[in-house]
Amino acid sequence: MYSAIRSSLPLDGSLGDYSDGTNLPIDACLVLTTDPKPRLRWTSELHERFVDAVTQLGGPDKATPKTIMRTMGVKGLTLYHLKSHLQKFRLGRQSCKESIDNSKDVSCVAESQDTGSSSTSSLRLAAQEQNESYQVTEALRAQMEVQRRLHEQLEVQRRLQLRIEAQGKYLQSILEKACKAIEEQAVAFAGLEAAREELSELAIKASITNGCQGTTSTFDTTKMMIPSLSELAVAIEHKNNCSAESSLTSSTVGSPVSAALMKKRQRGVFGNGDSVVVGHDAGWVMPSSSIG
């Protein structure tokens, strides 16, 4: 359908006297249709040269069809072709720019939403961390309270143990003192029994001794009366008088005066009226009432 009309291009790229684009030799990159009114087909190569020219001129807003045609230097390219293509290029760039702006707006909105969601999530995380820290603080406080109560209970148990030990020591000392007192009482009782037995033996020996001397055979040790010092003094004096009288009697035997004197002296010397038997060989004198 399409046919390419090719012609040679000058090496310097000059356009000669055909600056308006008419009656120009056709460039090799131009492709025209075979219609009665041929139309230009913008190939990729031609479009690239157009874009390069527009870029060199400062963009689609500053470039004009004439400046673009001069910059491109393509023979056979008219102002009509460049004007329509430049208009389409501007519209395409504008739509691309709008689409880019829209995409930027969308991305900004998305970023703002992401920022909002991230801030919300950060607030949630902060609240969760604060709640967890509060729970940890409460748990630590409860643990410290339990430890304090346990320490108090241990202190009470320690004091109670000390009191129990002190009371046990006190009771042990009282028990030792009681055992010691009982032992002392037992020793004293044994000594008392020994003394009692010794006294009984001495009394029996004394009664046997008196029986051998002829005083009496029925001598009661329980009724034995030991004379006092005054009675012993009177008995000794009476003994002396008796010895004196015996000497007088031996010198005046058969005298009635001596007989009366002997009768007169045979009277009691103790306060109770008992007579005293005085022997020459006796060591001490007993009352007559104590002799059975």
Curated annotation (Swiss-Prot):
Q: What InterPro entries does the record point to?
A: Homeodomain-like_sf, Myb_CC_LHEQLE, Myb_dom, Myb_dom_plants, PHR1-like, SANT/Myb
Any one Gene Ontology molecular-function term assigned to this protein's record: DNA-binding transcription factor activity
Domain HTH myb-type residues, every copy:
34-94
Q: Does the keyword Coiled coil apply?
A: yes
User: Looking at the UniProt record for this protein, which Gene Ontology cellular component terms does it annotate, in alphabetical order?
Assistant: nucleus
Q: Subunit details for this protein?
A: Homo- and heterodimers. Interacts with PHL2, but not with PHR1.
What is the name attached to this protein's record?
A: Protein PHR1-LIKE 3
Species whose genome carries this gene? Arabidopsis thaliana (Mouse-ear cress)
